[in-house]
């Protein structure tokens, strides 16, 4: 009986050992899988073309001589645009020096109003002598019929009242964020010719206008033509976990790392970089993440993004306010109001 007991226990131990060994092998195989990838030293993300040559043909000559066909959309139909796109509404013949493009969504009416009443007020910037225009960028509804008409009707009324919405004819969705980036940059390049700087920012961020302007003032003329900045990720790894929101298969991107890129929540860039990106995005294979795609194009152009310590991807503490440029995490209206009040900028941003 005792011998049978020992044999039974031994059998049980062997089963447990084999099970653990199997789990260990699977785990090691998975770790090897997610760590694989080609070094960026061999980076040739399609298309393998000279973006500077294409840029020269498009912006420096009267006729586009490029024989290379873009692989991405070059333009999007505009459903709504402000009467004064990149002019000051109260001074139609005066162009802004800084244009802020707020990436919003159709139903985010409250977020847009919160921004208009706070850091989106042009007086926040005019107080420091900088003419600014803030525009909200939207796609269209995925619904059809009466649902589309109701939502679009509200957006139409909003634009009639405020005149600060740019709406493009692609479905508003997470998978189309790269289209929103392309459309926004094309609009900026074509309509905002006098602007020196652009900001791309999500509508759940709070911005600190004085600190943003201080950052802009420190950009040298030498650095200006290649200046782009934000919360830069220096060694970002592609996510290889299936079913993850950020999953990218090797077939789409075979490299072990992404090039450095500024996180999409807040990006500050010069007009020349916006022009370069608007061209480069047409000839670069897209991934589902707009900030990663920006990094791909910058890498092809040989441009290194600048990290800004004042751009926060999480909510701030009091100790960070002095150098804060923008902060993420303020979708809730009451939270937005309390966060804005904490910055103490109401006096310079009032009408």
Q: Residue locations for each model-derived region?
A:
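Secretory-pathway lumenal glyco-enzymes, predominantly type II signal-anchor Golgi glycosyltransferases
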Residues: 1-351
